[in-house]
UniProtKB/Swiss-Prot annotation:
It comes from the Eukaryota. One of its GO terms (biological process) is proton transmembrane transport. It comes from Mus musculus. Belongs to the V-ATPase E subunit family. This is V-type proton ATPase subunit E 2. Testis specific.
Amino acid sequence: MALTDIDVQKQIKHMMAFIEQEANEKAEEIDAKAEEEFNIEKGRLVQTQRLKIMDYFEKKEKQIEQQKKIQLSTMRNQARITVLRARDNLILELLKDAKMRLSRIVSDEEIYQDLLDKLVLQALLRLLEPVMIVRCRPQDLHLVESAVLRAIPQYMRLCQKHLEVQVDQTEHLPSNAAGGVEVYSSDQKIKVSNTLESRLNLAAMQKMPEIRGILFGDNTSRKFFT
């Protein structure tokens, strides 16, 4: 039976409707897949950025913490240095005061003469040279000459050796020095310093742990800011 034009038109419409439905379903499927992929990619990007932000702030937090530690350490060191400097200044002031007190000893000629006798003999016994030169302040020449005269027989008795001692008449210790003597070998290559300043400095060095202990307590510097 032959198809009429109406039947043909109906079949064409039916086929067109089927194709259109198929196309719509395919388009919806593509849209759904695209949206799914978009959401997956968006989630991945969001997670990546989130991790980057977390990593950034974690690093910043560590940097801030490290800076705080450095600043705290610097502050502690500065405070420690300030305390140590103040202690050193106090000790220097005490030594300065002690040196000023030496002038009182020198001003009493009897006491100073007795001290020079001991300083000269001690220096001779330390140097132990056959010929020695004694140098002093210009204002102490007469006292030192007397001290040398008394020291020579004591030296010879103790060492069983003869010696020659010259009091330097041309070169002297500074007149503003605290006092005492320097004793040289004949070629002046060896020297024993027995000035009042050197004796004070030596005593201060030897007694420094005790001085610090009295002033600041035992091992205070070691315990400071620990």
